[in-house]
Amino acid sequence: MKTIAFAWRYLWSRPLTAALNVLLLGLGLASITFLLLVSHQLSRAFERDLAGIDVVVGAKGSPMQLILSGVLHLDVPTGNVPLAAIKALQTHPQVARIIPVSLGDSFRGYRIVGTTGDYLKHYGVQLQQGVMWTQPMQTVIGAQVARQSGLKVGDRFAGTHGLGSSGGGGVVHEKTPYTVVGILASSGTVLDRLLLTATESVWKVHETDTALDAEDQKILEEEREVTLALIQYTTPLAAVTFPRFVNTTTEMQAAAPALEITRLLSMVGVGTDVLRAFAGVLLLTAGLSVFIALWSAVRERRAYLALLRMLGAPPGKIAALLLVEALWLALLATVLGMLAGQALMALLGWALQLEQSVLVGGIAWPVELLAVPALALVVALASALLPAWEAFRVSGFELLQSASN
């Protein structure tokens, strides 16, 4: 206990140097903490939103764009596909369930999604207030939508054409307002930031604005489209043959969410590697700074350390003072770094929420964070080894020699 207390006092005998070392090491650890949290929370968010969706079928174009627009709702869709073509897939022996998704409108930047009740069942989300829609032009809104927009059960609103995050600039469908009949409980899934309604609602909104007469209305009904379909397989073996079937025999494309998200994460990983390298440079710089500080401390305290040796302190205890001092630095920097990393993650989550993007943020302590104190320990001990060895070699005779001189 005395060694620990002495090391603490030695550390703060030079407060500016100690504070700078803690800050420098803490910044490196904060960067590592932030990267680990981003990776963990993004992976969890994608897992929640992609769970149980084996393939997405939509208009031809970019497969990644199809996944980002239809599952994560982060991009514009590749186009629409005929309703008849999607219905034809329902009879395919490898298809267990199809969930149609129709996009095109939004409210204050939040997307209005035409679908069926299976969409809610798929994610297992429960109603917090109100009831499910039972007819067109009724909507159930996500928890984040309700919180940010102020909409309540019974409120009416008109959608805006387009999926822009600003929610402005598009045509407002004032002739066909929606009525809020339910609010979903917060689930942490993509449903938190969506307004869900029957597919017929989306058709009705656009047919009302487009049809000039009854004949036009009939033609539009015969040519109805959806944006895409979320599909579950009857067997995992379908992943080999079903996408090829869709891509080669229809005018649509099939994209596997797991494959496209892996590609996305690998692309994002390039930027992550740069940040990780930057954090590594910070840690190396911090280690060098700690080494210089401890080495200087040994030089400055050499007479005092020699006095301790003359008073009977063993060499191991003298060296331990330097090692414990380094451990104090590691402990303080770890606390600072992990708190700063959590704060940065919360700030990122808040910013993404404002952009109606992926739901991340909040306090999380994944097992990967154990790497942070381990890194701090390695850097501190590596920096303290040579100074500790120098302290170990201090002899009581040095004090006598300096006194005789």
State the predicted function of each range.
Residues M1-T33, L323, S404:
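N-terminal Sec/SRP start-transfer signal
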Residues L11, R309-G316, V394, A403:
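Short helix-to-coil transition segments within interhelical loops
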Residues L20-S31, T272-I292, A326-G337, A371-V372, ...:
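Alpha-helical transmembrane segments of integral membrane proteins
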Residues L36-R111, D118, Q135, F242-V246, ...:
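Hydrophobic, regular-secondary-structure patches
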Residues S106-G117, V125-D213:
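Hydrophobic secondary-structure segments that place a key small or acidic residue at a functional site
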Residues V172-T179, I183-T272:
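Mechanotransmission and gating elements of multispan inner-membrane complexes involved in transport
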Residues L282-T285, W295-A297, R302-G349, V379, ...:
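Transmembrane alpha-helical interface segments in multi-pass membrane proteins
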Residues V335-A374, L385-E398:
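Short helix-loop junctions at transmembrane helix boundaries
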